[in-house]
């Protein structure tokens, strides 16, 4: 099968390489000039989307923002997986996404949208509790304050640095944070769903800057026993069906004694838990993408129903800071053949001598993945690869096994389903 990846920042290049390993003919086009050198020598690339490509090509998108292009390609007769105007709206317009959650009967924390820094600063100064900052269009990393003073300082820093003001300030909700994902075929979702725990801070004990994702663990969700499913993402089904949504969608939520609180959606393949999910698939990835591109009904999601997939991100400085390019040409050695199947690479290339090297850009090298019967064993396998690799100035966390095991115990105590509530979502916001 011939595949074409349309990528914004190269997040889906690991998917493209997986398809090559499965024997498919794959090409990719990348929009962001900073990562144009990623995967040189690993996959074939074209400078821009070529509409003369054969109609039998399966096209897939890895990020938000390309919805109009994806829908235009579908209208021209191409089979396109993922990417839609509705998906863009869900991720890039947080106010609308939160409104849709409320319409679906999902409770959300009080939130306010701002398009200028002074108004946001004034709001934070008047607020007595903790706040969460979330940028529309994903231009600035999310931030959770420890109190009103540091949120004011954070906002003033963004203003001084000339960052675009388009953001939400959301009241902090204490509880256990978890992501729940379903794959939707336009009518219904495939079973089982899956859950993800994620840690963002770069260093052990949640110290240091937020890195987007330092590591995660994924497992299949038995929905009949889970409040997150019943009170959370399953309530979105009528809205997803109304929009004939096709692809994966992830609800990030907080679970506490008051129930499930919806925070945000992630409707794209280039999300941080996808590498770990790959280790749990029981079908080839190419078959899975092709089914959703063709619009086939997909009642069964091909994932192991017992055990845990895991991923640990390995980076080099100045990651996670992107204002300065990471060094280019650092060798990545000591990866044995078996490791390659559990290595989801990012800012790397293969030189003329066959040596894998850093490509510069952001300094994200790879997520090393694994599958195990329990959380400790799955994380331990990831750490074995991370320890073995020879990479100058590598950075990764070493405490995720114990951290995620503790979270999992807390989660099992928190997910018992409450008495059913009759919630019928209105469709006033989905037309």
Question: Where does each model-flagged region fall?
Answer:
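ATP-binding N-terminal substructure of ATP-dependent carboxylate-amine bond-forming enzymes
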Residues: 1-86
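Active-site "cap" helix and flanking loop/linker of ATP-utilizing ligase/carboxylase catalytic domains
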Residues: 229-249, 266-340, 350-353
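A cross-kingdom feature marking charged/low-complexity
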Residues: 399-431
């Amino acid at each position: 099968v011939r595949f074409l990846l349309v990528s914004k920042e190269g997040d889906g290049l690991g998917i493209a390489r997986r398809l090559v390993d499965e024997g498919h003919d794959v090409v990719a086009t990348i929009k962001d000039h900073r990562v144009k050198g990623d995967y040189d020598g690993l996959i074939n690339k074209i400078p821009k989307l070529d509409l003369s490509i054969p109609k039998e090509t399966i096209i897939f998108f890895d990020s938000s923002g390309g919805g109009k292009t994806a829908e235009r390609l579908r209208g021209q007769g191409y089979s396109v997986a993922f990417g839609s105007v509705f998906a863009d709206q869900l991720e890039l317009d947080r106010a609308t996404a939160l409104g849709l959650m409320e319409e679906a009967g999902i409770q959300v924390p009080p939130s306010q949208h701002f398009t200028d820094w002074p108004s946001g600063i004034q709001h934070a100064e008047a607020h007595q509790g903790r706040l969460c900052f979330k940028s529309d269009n994903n231009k600035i990393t999310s931030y959770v304050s420890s109190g009103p003073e540091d949120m004011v300082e954070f906002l003033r820093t963004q203003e001084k640095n000339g960052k675009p003001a388009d953001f939400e300030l959301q009241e902090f909700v204490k509880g256990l944070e978890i992501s729940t994902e379903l794959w939707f075929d336009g009518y219904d979702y495939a079973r089982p769903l899956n859950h993800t725990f994620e840690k963002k801070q770069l260093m052990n004990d949640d110290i240091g800057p937020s890195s987007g994702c330092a590591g995660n663990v994924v497992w299949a969700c038995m929905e009949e026993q889970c409040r997150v499913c019943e009170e959370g993402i399953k309530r979105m089904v009528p809205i997803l069906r109304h929009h004939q949504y096709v692809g994966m969608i992830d609800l990030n939520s907080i679970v506490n004694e008051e129930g499930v609180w919806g925070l945000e959606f992630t409707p794209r393949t280039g999300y941080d838990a996808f590498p770990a999910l790959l280790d749990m698939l029981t079908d080839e990835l190419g078959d899975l993408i092709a089914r959703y591109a063709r619009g086939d009904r997909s009642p069964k999601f091909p994932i192991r129903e017992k055990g845990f997939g895991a991923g640990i991100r390995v980076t080099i400085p100045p990651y996670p800071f992107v204002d300065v390019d990471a060094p280019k040409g650092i060798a990545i050695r000591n990866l044995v053949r078996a490791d390659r199947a559990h290595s989801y690479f990012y800012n790397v290339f293969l030189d003329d001598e066959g040596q894998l090297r850093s490509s510069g850009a952001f300094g994200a090298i790879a997520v090393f993945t694994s599958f195990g019967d329990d959380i400790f064993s799955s994380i331990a396998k990831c750490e074995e690869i991370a320890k073995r690799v020879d990479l100058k100035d590598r950075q990764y966390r070493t405490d995720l096994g114990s951290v995620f095991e503790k979270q999992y115990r807390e989660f099992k105590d928190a997910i018992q389903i409450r008495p059913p509530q009759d919630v019928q979502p209105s469709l006033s916001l989905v037309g």
